[in-house]
């Protein structure tokens, strides 16, 4: 089954991919790697804001990380034409807007990792880092950066 | 027009490239990519210090990010001999020393992105992430990391 | 002398490599690069926790960064079979759990850089970034991410 078919089968709908808000671009192919700009957590209501350990729970963070991954897939579909062009997910860097001492960034970034494996299977397994930071664009709860390999 | 000519035409002068302060190096070529160490914001008076949202404005941050990009170009010129060896800018990671909840890291990192496009044109467009962090070396206002592709 | 022999000669023992705690993997080879997941600081007693500038000194941070580098080498040995397969260390990103305004992340990440050069010599010299962040997994003092090139 192709990835596009897998997405259709799950009923997952990708969001509209965002435009870059400055002199940068959303995706760049170099050789067989596609580098992606960091995207912030959004849903149909707008930016998912807040701070883990302050006014946001781990569950809300998990949903925000999943939303970031969906946005990155939307960016990739626009960039590549189809997600079936992706050979594998290489790396994910997840940044969580968090209070000092918040010890669960991984439980939040799991929202992205789980989605990628749900859609891509073993090829969706990636290396990653999960970091808590003091400030993200538009006060987003999560920012996610990714590199993927194409065939 | 070559990039070196473009820089000369704008009157931009690159700073002296910094030396690595430990057991690491400023730049490393692997295949057709050049990976660069993070550099902190400096001008002719020394390190540009401070914290966005506390004692530094967005405009000061923008200038600090631009200064980082100039420093990275100086590192690249030393590493490659000439900036004309650069095929394109691939990625920029910008870290802003920021108070918790500062929502404008992108407006600061634009200082780097705008400079890269000013000098390299479309080949200067890159993917990027803009993150606010609690602490940077020597209390710098901005740290910038970059990857470029060579011909 | 091979790297494995060099390690044996120094008496350094690598720790047990950690398992990935979710839908991600510890290492992934793409072309001649091996990307590694971020690892947190641990020793034989468990996670090395704490915050630089609050309850941890630079010396404790240096030891924690060195411990992260040892863990990453253990991951690489498991992934590649032998550390002799490594051609060179490419990049290191070091994140330090730090109070706002802590100005010495590089002195802490030197613990990793020094170890890599101790073991790999000139091939261990890498590009790097050292960043202070507000929160790391399990309240770890240091998290380290690395990319290496293989022959």
Predicted regions and their residues:
Chain A
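Short, polar/acidic, helix-capping and beta-turn segments at strand->helix junctions
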Residues: 1-151
């Amino acid at each position: 089954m192709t990835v596009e078919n897998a997405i259709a089968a799950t009923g997952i709908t990708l969001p509209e991919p965002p435009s870059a808000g400055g002199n940068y671009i959303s995706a760049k192919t170099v050789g067989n790697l596609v580098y992606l700009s960091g995207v912030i957590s959004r849903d149909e209501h707008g930016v998912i804001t807040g701070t883990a350990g302050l006014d946001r729970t781990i569950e809300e963070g998990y949903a925000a990380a999943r939303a970031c991954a969906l946005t990155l897939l939307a960016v990739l579909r626009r960039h590549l034409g189809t997600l079936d062009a992706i050979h594998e997910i290489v790396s994910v860097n997840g940044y969580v807007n968090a209070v000092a001492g918040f010890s669960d960034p991984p439980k939040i970034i799991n929202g992205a990792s789980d989605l990628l494996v749900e859609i891509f299977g073993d090829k969706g397994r990636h290396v990653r880092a999960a970091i808590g930071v003091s400030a993200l664009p538009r006060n987003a709860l999560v920012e996610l950066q990714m590199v993927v390999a194409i065939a």
